């Protein structure tokens, strides 16, 4: 039993916090016009994507329409200076082609003035992040009795995250009175998450100095995939009087319909001498968890938007409150043996290493926007919105793994133009995003590596910056608008 208590302390220093998903609610906005207007669809009808933002505003649509939208491509750059130690940066530059969407709102039979139906299929999350770097240096890590002089230290780190979420929505709206309308939307979310993190470090002796130990090494490798099907409901109200529009949307917490996945994890310590031990030996931990039933939660949210029309200008503002989610277990490893060989004693430590958990803090995202009509066929649009991270970054970091990775706030700035034809409309625009955290914690450190810390240095904090530029294009076809 003493051996496993000792190993628990060792392995906890080797396993970094696990991060793995896009950590923002509003990174991808549905619909090009709504994206350029930073969420103005909360308060008034913008295009057929209203079924997702505020179904009640569909009652203000003057004709049936089908929208084809695509954020055609985006370039993202994330940089963490000295993220793995002095002179060892963590950085990634990635160009992605984002999936498009289709949305439509249609009158129900001949009751267009009383009822409307909307449908949409779109990408709610599309996030890929990959960090990798390697450091080679000469330093004295192992005692000179066993490894005389300095050793060659080689450290490597890789993090690869891929999160995709596709949503299908169907909504219905009805007119309650001259000024009020109501709507309801049901959304089915299909979420797929892939994660891999690897760290390995080696202290290699100089063979010319007759060492008694040739190599000391440590490695941790964890990989998992998690799949979900979730159901989420929205209820909405829209009020319109003169130049003013008001929208209110209540979104219920997501309900799990299906989940599955697997995880494989491994730790190897070779010729290591843990603290308070006089002997060197090698240790091994490995587990494969299959047929998992992971959990994932979206919180309750309440959105309010308001807009006012002037002669050639529409100004909009909105905000969304997201409730908190207390710490919950995403993946429970159960009684799987991790430390090898398996015994009755080491099962109790598995949960401390392999349990995956999450916790969401409450937050409010806000937005403002303007649309200026140059003429009946052309308008200019612009806006900005906040996109705050929702993870609770707990210090000190508890045992087990936390899901989110991008623990920094983001801010989106949008600009574009709308070109209207007889029965169609084109929208072109661009979005610039910026995020930064000045107290971001290193996942690992190569500085001052020591054997007592399993060939790692003490992790510190630094500044991480993220910038992105995304192109936005959409085409809207009006089904029943008469040609001019």
Q: Which residue ranges define each predicted feature?
A:
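Short, Lys/Arg-enriched, disordered terminal segments
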Residues: 1-5, 483-484
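Sec-dependent N-terminal signal peptides
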Residues: 4-14
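Single-residue recognition of alpha-helix boundary sites
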Residues: 13-14, 65, 189, 253
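N-terminal, post-signal peptide beta-strand-biased segments of exported outer-membrane/organellar beta-barrel
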Residues: 18-125, 254, 406-408
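Outer-membrane beta-barrel porins/channels
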Residues: 21-30, 34-35, 105-484
């Amino acid at each position: 039993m003493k051996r496993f208590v000792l190993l628990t302390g060792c392995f906890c220093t080797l396993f970094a916090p696990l991060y793995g998903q896009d950590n923002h609610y509003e990174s991808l906005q549905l619909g090009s016009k709504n994206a350029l207007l930073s969420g103005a669809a909360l308060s008034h009808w913008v295009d057929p994507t209203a079924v997702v933002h505020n179904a009640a505003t569909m009652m203000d649509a003057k004709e049936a329409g089908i929208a084809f939208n695509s954020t055609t491509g985006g370039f993202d750059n994330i940089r963490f200076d000295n993220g793995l130690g002095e002179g060892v940066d963590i950085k990634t530059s990635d160009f992605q082609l984002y999936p498009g969407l289709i949305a439509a709102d249609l009158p129900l039979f001949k009751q267009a003035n009383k009822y409307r139906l909307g449908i949409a299929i779109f990408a709610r999350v599309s996030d890929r992040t990959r960090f990798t770097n390697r450091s080679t240096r000469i330093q004295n890590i192992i005692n000179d009795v066993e490894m005389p002089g300095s050793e060659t230290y080689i450290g490597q780190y890789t993090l690869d995250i891929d999160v995709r979420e596709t949503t299908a929505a169907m909504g219905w709206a009805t007119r309650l009175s001259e000024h009020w309308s109501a709507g309801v939307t049901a959304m089915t979310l299909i979420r797929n998450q892939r994660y891999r993190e690897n760290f390995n470090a080696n202290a290699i002796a100089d063979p010319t100095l007759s060492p008694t130990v040739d190599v000391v090494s440590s490695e941790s490798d964890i990989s998992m995939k998690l799949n979900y099907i979730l159901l989420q409901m929205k209820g909405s109200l829209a009020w319109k009087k003169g130049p003013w529009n008001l929208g209110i949307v209540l979104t219920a917490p997501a309900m799990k319909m299906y989940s599955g996945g697997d995880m494989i994890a491994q730790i190897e310590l070779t010729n290591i001498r843990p603290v308070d031990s006089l002997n060197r030996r090698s240790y091994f931990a490995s587990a494969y968890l299959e047929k998992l039933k992971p959990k994932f939660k979206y919180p309750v949210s309440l959105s309010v938007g308001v807009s006012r029309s002037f002669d050639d200008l529409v100004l909009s503002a909105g905000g969304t409150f997201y409730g908190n989610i207390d710490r919950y277990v995403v993946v429970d490893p159960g009684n799987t043996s991790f430390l090898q060989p398996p015994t009755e004693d080491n099962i109790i430590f598995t949960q401390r290493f392999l349990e995956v958990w999450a916790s969401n803090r409450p937050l409010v995202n806000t937005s403002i926007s303007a649309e200026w009509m140059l003429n009946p066929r052309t308008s200019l649009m612009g806006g900005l919105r906040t996109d705050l991270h929702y993870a609770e970054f707990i210090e000190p970091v508890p045992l087990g793994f936390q899901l989110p990775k991008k623990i920094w706030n983001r801010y989106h700035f949008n600009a574009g133009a709308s070109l209207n034809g007889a029965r169609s409309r084109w929208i072109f625009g661009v979005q610039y995003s910026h995020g930064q955290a000045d107290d971001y914690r290193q996942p690992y450190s190569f500085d001052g590596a020591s054997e007592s810390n399993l060939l790692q240095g003490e992790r510190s904090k630094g500044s991480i910056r993220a910038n992105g530029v995304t192109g936005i294009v959409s085409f809207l076809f009006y089904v029943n608008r008469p040609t001019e």
